[in-house]
Amino acid sequence: MFCIQCEQTISTPTTKGCSYTMGMCGKTAEVSDLQDVLIYLLQGVSDYAVKARSVGIVDQAIDAYVCQALFSTLTNVNFDAARIIAFINEAQQNRDSLKSRYEAACLLAGKAPEAATGPAALILTADKAELLAWAPNAAVNRNYKEIGEDILGLRLLCLYGLKGAAAYMEHARVLGQQDDEVGAEFHQIMMFLGTEPTEMQPLIDCAMQIGQMNFKVMALLDKGETETFGHPEPTRVNMKPVAGKAILVSGHDLHDLEKILQQTEGKGINVFTNGEMLPAHAYPAFKKYPHLVGNYGSAWQNQQKEFAAFPGAVVMTSNCIINPNVGKYADRIYTRSIVGWPGVTHIEGDDFSTVIEKALSLDGFPYDEIPHYTMTGFARNALMAAAPAVIDQVKAGNIKHFFLIGGCDGDKQERGYYTEMAKAVPQDSLILTLACGKFKFNDLEFGDINGIPRLLDVGQCNDAYSAIQLALALAEAFECGVNDLPLSLVLSWFEQKAIVILLTLLSLGVKGIRVGPSVPGFLTPNLLNFLNETFDLRPITTVEQDLKDILAA
C-alpha cells in the first residue's frame, strides 16, 4: 500500500504517505492496492477510447463508466474490495469491447490498428489473490527511485486532479450533461498518464489542461443543476431537529435527494440534508416539498457522532463516508452510486423503499428543537443579480475587500484557523464560502453591509464556478484583471475535488491563493517553490500574519 492523496495522510520528517496495513482514512491496504490496479486498467480503457475515437467510435456508456470507476478511488468513497474488483472486471470488458470495435473499423478502412502496450495490453484474472499479487506493478510510486520525487509529485498532482474532475463529470452526467469533447480530453489525459511520463514540462502542462477541462465540467454541472432544479435563491435553513420520522441525505447528489423527496411524500417522514447537501434547500424545485425540513449535522468528519445520534435512516449519495461501525449505525445507512462500505446495504436504481421502510421502523425525533437558521443560496444567478449593488457599495467605499474562505473541512485542530480568519475579517469586507468548510463558521452572525449579507454561502464545492463568475464580473466592471481585485482566496483542502478546483483556479491565472491547513504531501519542496514563484501560491501561516499581508497588498 502507498497512498498520499488526502490531507490526513501520514506526514512526518521521515515518512510521507500511508503505507502500512491501513490508511488514515480507514482504507485497508487490500482496497488501496486494488484501487491502484483499477486505475492502471482504466488508463488502458482510455487508451482504447482514444484509438476508437480516431475511427469515429464514441461510447458514452464507457465514457461514463471510466469516470464512475475513477470516482470510486477518491478519498472516503468506496472501501468495499468486492465492489472494486467488480470495477476491475468491468474495466477489462470495456477495454476489450473498444479494442474489438476499433480493430474491426481499422480492418474496414484498410489500415493496420495500433498495437496495445502498457495498461491497454494488460490481462488479469478476477481472482483477488492474483490481483493483489500483481498490485505492486500498479502502485502510484512504483518507480519513484528512477524518476525522482518531483516527477512523482507532478504525476500525482495530475492523477489526483483528474480524479476530482471525474467526480464532477459523474455528477454532471447524472443530471443529463455529458460532453463528448470533454470526454475525449479526459481519455487523452488518462492515456498520457498511463505512459508514465518523465518530463517535467509536459506534466505541468497536463496539470493546467486538467484545470481548464474542469472549468468546462463545472459549467456543465452548473447547467445540469440549474436547468433541472432552477437557480438557487438566498434561503434560510433550519439547522435543528424537527419532530417525526426521519431520513438524512448526505453527499452531493441532488438527483437522489429529489427521488427521496418524491417517494416520501405523504408518508409522514421528514427529510434532512447533511454536509454538502445543505445548499439543496436553495433550489426552487425542492421548495415545493414541505417535508424537506432542514439540515442536520455539519461536515463529514463529524458523522460518526452525528449519524449515531440521528434517529432515522441515512443515505450516502457520494463522498464522504467513514466507518459506520464506530457509531453502530451500519444497519441504517445506505450507499448509492460509487459509494461503498463492506456490509452496508447498497441501493441500485432509484427505488428507495428500503430506506423508507427503515425510517418508518425507527423512532425519529420526539420533539422540535428551537430553530437555528443559516443562509445559503448565493450561487451564480443570485450573485450576478447582486453584483450591481455590490459594485455600488465598492465605489462608495463601504465594501473594501472580498474573501473566499472555504473548501474541505476536516478534524485537524489546525483547521480552527478558518474560523478565526472569518471572525477577524474587517467589517467592511464580504466573505464568500462554499463546500463543507463553511461549517467552520456558518453558525456565526456576520451582519450585513447596507443590506448585503457579509457572509455569502455560494454552495457546494463545485459551486466555485459561481465564485469565479462573480470575480470575472467584478473584474469587468472595474476594468481590471481578477488578480487586481481586492479579492483574497483562503482555501482549505482535504481531497481530490479540492485539488482539481485549485488546478482550475491556477489554470485561469488566479494568483495569491493561500492553502491549508497543510500543503499536499505529494508536493515536494521544489514543486512548492515552483507553484509559489509561478502562481504566488502559499501555505497559510497565522491569522494575524496572513490578514496583515492580505490587507497590506
Swiss-Prot record:
InterPro entries: HCP/CODH, Hydroxylam_reduct, Prismane-like_a/b-sand, Prismane-like_sf, Prismane_a-bundle. Its main location: cytoplasm. Its EC number is 1.7.99.1. GO terms for biological process: response to hydrogen peroxide. GO terms for molecular function: 2 iron, 2 sulfur cluster binding; hydroxylamine reductase activity; metal ion binding; peroxidase activity. It catalyses: A + NH4(+) + H2O = hydroxylamine + AH2 + H(+). Binds 1 [2Fe-2S] cluster. Its cofactor is [2Fe-2S] cluster; hybrid [4Fe-2O-2S] cluster. It holds the Pfam family Prismane. Keywords: 2Fe-2S, Cytoplasm, Iron, Iron-sulfur, Metal-binding, Oxidoreductase. Hybrid [4Fe-2O-2S] cluster binds at H252, E276, C320, C408, C436, C461, E495, K497. It is found in: Cytoplasm. The modification Cysteine persulfide is found at C408. [2Fe-2S] cluster binds at C3, C6, C18, C25. GO terms for cellular component: cytoplasm. Belongs to the HCP family. Catalyzes the reduction of hydroxylamine to form NH(3) and H(2)O. This is Hydroxylamine reductase. It comes from Tolumonas auensis (strain DSM 9187 / NBRC 110442 / TA 4). The gene is hcp.
